[in-house]
């Protein structure tokens, strides 16, 4: 507050003025007709005295006002300088505060950009891993389709098919998991970029405010670019307070840091998912390959046994054919003695009169015929049995050959088709998205 000189009353001054009261005065010569329109001499003196006094008072008041004005100008000049210096210092402090916030925002933006790039790399790994699962899935489905072409009785739901179905289900589940994780990564990348953009806008505002305050800090009373802005002192309704301004930036930083932490956690999760899924796929691939190997060993062993039985069956067929031929020859050999005995009986039936006797020779011939018939019956039954056995052997021979052919076909499918195709299975690095 400027100090002023307090007002005070002027001292009374006496003035020595010569009065016109001599012998030749005209004070008494006034006529009655002019008396009313003229002043008295005393009035004239009083008027002069009043003018003198008024002039002195005005000069004295002017001197006091000049003194007060000079003093006020000096004080206001000093006050203006102090105020300007204080404002410059305050603007400088604000510059430091703005620079501090700007630096924190800059660091957070750089950290968020780096984190986003790392998450983008993880997303690309997920996409490569998802693409890599297409090869195992096509291999598995091709194996299942190829094994559908196995012939009876080898078209069975064996351990290999069970493992292949488990592998197909595992691949489908992993593909769904990778797709969900990719969508989660895309969403997190979008959030990272949104918060980075928010920090960039805040940083840009602070950069502009910093430049403005820096320009303000360089202004002084001798600056030529300053102008009068009478309405600049009006507060804007949208103006923030230091507390709300700091809270706004702090909230932006906290949200950005929170998303950056969530992004880092997601990257760790992606690493775990890719490691686990690639290991699970390779373990299941090894399980399928092991099942194929065991199944091929079983087929090889079964085919070897079938070949062994086929060899024995062929030998038995040969022996049985010889047996059938021998039985036929034996039957043929029994026909001549039977015909002899029957001829003898026939001829002896023509003996005359008492010579037609049932003698020992007759009974022996009858028993011979009966024995020969029984032998022929037994031989014919045995021949039928031998022929049926031969037919059975021929049937089993055909069945064995069909089974061997089916086993050979199954071995070809499992070994030459399926296992050869499975050599194209991706490596663990490809399944983990590194290649």
UniProtKB/Swiss-Prot annotation:
What are the boundaries of the region Disordered? 60-96
Coiled-coil boundaries = 102-180, 310-336, 363-411
How is this protein annotated for GO cellular component? axonemal A tubule inner sheath; axonemal microtubule; microtubule cytoskeleton; nucleus; sperm flagellum
Give an example GO biological process.
Answer: cilium assembly
Could you tell me where this protein is found in the cell? Answer: Cytoplasm, Cytoskeleton, Cilium axoneme; Cytoplasm, Cytoskeleton, Flagellum axoneme
UniProtKB keywords: Cell projection, Cilium, Cilium biogenesis/degradation, Coiled coil, Cytoplasm, Cytoskeleton, Flagellum, Ubl conjugation
UniProt feature, compositional bias: Basic and acidic residues: 60-69
Q: Which domain of life is it from?
A: Eukaryota
List the Pfam families: Tektin (PF03148)
Q: Where is it chiefly localized?
A: cytoplasm
Q: Is Cytoplasm one of the keywords?
A: yes
Share the record's PTM remark: Ubiquitinated, leading to its degradation. Deubiquitinated by USP16, promoting its stability.
> Tissue-wise, where is it found?
Strongly expressed in spermatozoa. Also detected at low levels in pancreas. Expressed in airway epithelial cells.
Its biological function?
Microtubule inner protein (MIP) part of the dynein-decorated doublet microtubules (DMTs) in cilia and flagellar axoneme. Forms filamentous polymers in the walls of ciliary and flagellar microtubules. Contributes to normal sperm motility.
Q: Which family does it belong to?
A: Belongs to the tektin family.
Name-wise, this protein is: Tektin-4
Lineage of producing organism: Eukaryota, Metazoa, Chordata, Craniata, Vertebrata
Q: Source gene?
A: TEKT4
């Amino acid at each position: 507050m400027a100090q002023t000189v307090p007002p005070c009353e002027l001292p009374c001054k006496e003035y020595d003025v010569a009065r016109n009261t001599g012998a030749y005065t005209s004070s008494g010569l006034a006529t009655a007709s002019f008396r009313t329109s003229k002043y008295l001499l005393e009035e004239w003196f009083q008027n002069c005295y009043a003018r003198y006094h008024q002039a002195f008072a005005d000069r004295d008041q002017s001197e006091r006002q000049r003194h007060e004005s000079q003093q006020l100008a000096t004080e206001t000049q000093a006050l203006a300088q102090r105020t300007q210096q204080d404002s410059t210092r305050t603007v400088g402090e604000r510059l430091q505060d703005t620079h501090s916030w700007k630096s924190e925002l800059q660091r957070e933006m750089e950290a968020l950009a780096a984190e986003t790039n790392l998450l983008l790399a993880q997303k690309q790994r997920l996409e490569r891993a998802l693409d890599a699962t297409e090869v195992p899935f096509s291999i598995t489905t091709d194996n299942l389709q190829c094994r559908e072409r196995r012939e009876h009785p080898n078209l069975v739901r064996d351990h290999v098919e069970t493992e292949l179905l488990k592998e197909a289900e595992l691949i489908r589940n992993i593909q769904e998991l990778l797709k969900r994780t990719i969508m989660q990564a895309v969403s997190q990348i979008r959030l990272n970029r949104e918060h980075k953009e928010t920090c960039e806008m805040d940083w840009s505002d602070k950069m502009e405010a910093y430049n403005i305050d820096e320009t303000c800090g360089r202004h002084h009373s001798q600056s030529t670019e300053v102008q009068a802005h009478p309405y600049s002192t009006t507060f804007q309704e949208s103006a923030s307070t230091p507390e709300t301004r700091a809270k706004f930036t702090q909230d932006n930083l906290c949200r950005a840091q929170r998303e950056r932490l969530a992004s880092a956690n997601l990257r760790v999760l992606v690493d775990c998912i890719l490691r686990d899924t690639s290991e699970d796929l390779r373990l299941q691939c090894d399980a399928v390959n092991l099942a194929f190997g065991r199944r091929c060993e079983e087929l090889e062993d079964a085919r070897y046994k079938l070949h062994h039985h086929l060899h024995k069956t062929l030998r038995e067929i040969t022996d049985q054919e010889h047996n059938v031929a021998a039985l036929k020859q034996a039957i043929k050999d029994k026909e001549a003695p039977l015909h002899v005995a029957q001829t003898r009986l026939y001829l002896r039936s023509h003996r005359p009169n008492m010579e037609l006797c049932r003698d020992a020779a007759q009974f022996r011939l009858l028993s011979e015929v009966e024995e020969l018939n029984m032998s022929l019956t037994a031989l014919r039954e045995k021949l039928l049995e031998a022929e049926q056995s031969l037919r059975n052997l021929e049937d089993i021979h055909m069945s064995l050959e069909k089974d061997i052919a089916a086993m050979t076909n199954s071995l070809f499918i499992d070994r030459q088709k399926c296992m050869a195709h499975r050599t194209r299975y991706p490596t663990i690095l490809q399944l983990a998205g590194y290649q």
